[in-house]
């Protein structure tokens, strides 16, 4: 796996999010704010999760063929969940330019339910699928 490739993309996404936080005062009351820039970040971040999950799937012993029937969530992330308990991993938002006070917004488990599909999946996945498949309807 080319770790530098993923790391560089991650750092770029992080920089863009921090730049956005200079424009939008991100606090507990602003989490419903929507913009095309946020949609773009959601799509690009989700694509990176898809890509790295598939690469890790094969590195960690996944056996399904790499074709249209290999799903990043129910196949790749499910295998990684069984090995690493990804759903229990916590990310803490600690940037001083995010004005979050509620613990539910500071301590995140972004991969909780990420190995599921549809209405059972993670909120970010539902948003990603909605924006990816019907952007015009999803932003109204």
Describe each PLM feature range.
Residues 131-140:
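Charge-enriched, short contiguous segments at helix-coil
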Residues 1-44, 51, 55:
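Charged alpha-helical initiation segments
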Residues 50-126, 133-134:
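Short non-catalytic regulatory patches outside canonical folded cores
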Residues 43-46, 126:
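Amphipathic alpha-helical interface elements that mediate macromolecular binding in regulatory proteins
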